[in-house]
Amino acid sequence: VTFVDGFGRAVQVKKDGVVTSASKGNSAKDENVMIVSGRNMYDAFGRVAKAFYPTTEGTGSKSTFNKSFDNVSPTVTVYDVLDRATSVTLPDNSTTTTAYTVDNSSHTLVTTVTDALHNVQATHTNGSGKTLKTIQKSGPDGEITTSFEYDGIQRLVRVTDTEGNVTTSTYDMGDRRTEVNHPASGITSFTYDALGNVLTKQTANLAKEGKFITYDYDYQRLTGINYP
């Protein structure tokens, strides 16, 4: 059973369920209940401001809206004027904050997330929403930077880690990744059928022996993986 408000938003869902309880010295007991989804409270702009945990009720009132709230504090979300979440506070009062800035030198949007343990990660994205760089700013070894490069049609072709190690990817005309060159594991290659299903995979070690991992399908459903 789903209840919606005047804007068509689902505000409560009820489902049949079973709760099993047991106490010391007694056997487990099953009870048929209705599981009531946690209620959402919206702000003036229709955004979920508070999300409550689910609760339960008896089976005889499935068609009646349950106005009660769970005793656990709700998850509280704060937004900026662009509807982006800037703060999420969980029931245990731990808070994750998100700041949005612009890096004028690279013309990228920088999204900086700070979790409840004060771990900080900054993500740089371009106008297409592609991630160009991530920086973990609070690791024990200082900043850890990973950079991403794309070709003219926005396919990921190059990843550079904080040590300068480079992983490259090659694609065919169907935008299917045919080769990954990793500095540690070497070259891994893939072949595909006309429908885009992976037919073979060959790692650097298998290539030395001229062997492949092959894949079987039944109407595009994977049915088997064959190792040499």
Where are these regions (language model features)?
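Beta-strand elements of repeat-based all-beta scaffolds
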Residues: 1-228
